[in-house]
Amino acid sequence: MKKYIIICLTAYLSGCAQTPLNKETNSGYAEGLFEGAQLSDIKNRFVFACNQKGYSIKEANDNKVVCSRTMDGMSAIATQLAIGNSYSTTPEEILVFQLARLNNNVHASVRNYRETQMAFGQMSRVEIKNNKTTNIMQSSMDRIVSEYNSKREIPLTPTKIERLN
């Protein structure tokens, strides 16, 4: 009996353990700050990134980009069992990028969902918010932000001759 209790307790406690967050943010979601950016430029970057990863664009405006991709394999089966039933459509992975202009910068955050449609049209949606997923999203966001911030044009300083004129 003692072994059984120890095994159950160990399984329970190890199931509660999470990967630590690589970067703490105010919202708890993956965030990025694009310096000196326009909303339309950042929206286009996220649309491009979604297309490159095989997502389709459901919605794209200056403040929000919604991308989706039909899931496949075991993850689709597990998701369908968790949030749907045998009559549900194949689940979709949905990424929602929210963009906001702050002074001369654009602040972006991303949320991750799984969604399926039940037999009579009811939508079943669940947010995927755990440290592992947040870390993956944050590393992608950091890569996109650093690419943007390193490639943007830096204004040339006037030369000595231009200053004299």
What are these regions (language model features)?
Residues A17-N165:
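Ser/Thr-rich, low-complexity intrinsically disordered terminal regions
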Residues Y12-G15:
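C-terminal motif of bacterial Sec signal peptides marking the signal peptidase cleavage site
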Residues K2-I7:
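Sec-dependent signal peptide recognition
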Residues L9-T10, K43:
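Residue-level signal for mature regions of secreted extracellular proteins and peptides
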